[in-house]
Amino acid sequence: MKLSNKSQALYDMIAPAVEACGVDLWGIEFLPQGKRSLLRIYIDRTVDENAEPVINEDGEVEQGRGIGVEDCVRVTQQVGAMLDVHDPISGEYALEVSSPGWDRPFFQLEQLQGYIGQQVALRLIAAVENRRKFQAKLLAVDLENEEIQVEVEGKHVLDIDSNNIDKANLIYQD
């Protein structure tokens, strides 16, 4: 679950601009695609259950609300202007900003901690038990040893090194 050097540099550059918009930077995907690259930014909002409700200028309660279109527009404008000034991406690129959604991708091991007991889809770099793709129940996240523990098909438990995870997503369930 490590970002490439280019993605990490972009993440470090973008994070302050995103947070200045009052939202959290959940993660980024930088996908070089020939002449036109794609920079996808995922934003989220941390909900403090103990916080007093906030009433915005329209008289709406903001506590516990997710990411809205207005948040994406604000971040797009802020980050877009910053990227225009610093120009860290050579050539043309498309900038997308969205919430992580129901099937949220995970970019850092710490992000998985809030989803213990839920189903995740994993794509590994190197095969484990002759497989690179798993749908499994997340049992534990070990930050010290940088690994996760999952239950595959309700049958057996696997410990997976986080450095072997190419991609991880939540599997949405009703």
Curated annotation (Swiss-Prot):
<dbReference type="InterPro" id="IPR035956">
    <property type="entry name" value="RimP_N_sf"/>
</dbReference>
<dbReference type="GO" id="GO:0000028">
    <property type="term" value="P:ribosomal small subunit assembly"/>
</dbReference>
<dbReference type="InterPro" id="IPR028998">
    <property type="entry name" value="RimP_C"/>
</dbReference>
<dbReference type="GO" id="GO:0005829">
    <property type="term" value="C:cytosol"/>
</dbReference>
<dbReference type="InterPro" id="IPR036847">
    <property type="entry name" value="RimP_C_sf"/>
</dbReference>
<dbReference type="GO" id="GO:0006412">
    <property type="term" value="P:translation"/>
</dbReference>
<dbReference type="InterPro" id="IPR003728">
    <property type="entry name" value="Ribosome_maturation_RimP"/>
</dbReference>
<dbReference type="Pfam" id="PF02576">
    <property type="entry name" value="RimP_N"/>
</dbReference>
<protein>
    <recommendedName>
        <fullName>Ribosome maturation factor RimP</fullName>
    </recommendedName>
</protein>
<keyword id="KW-0963">Cytoplasm</keyword>
<comment type="similarity">
    <text>Belongs to the RimP family.</text>
</comment>
<keyword id="KW-0690">Ribosome biogenesis</keyword>
<dbReference type="Pfam" id="PF17384">
    <property type="entry name" value="DUF150_C"/>
</dbReference>
<comment type="function">
    <text>Required for maturation of 30S ribosomal subunits.</text>
</comment>
<dbReference type="InterPro" id="IPR028989">
    <property type="entry name" value="RimP_N"/>
</dbReference>
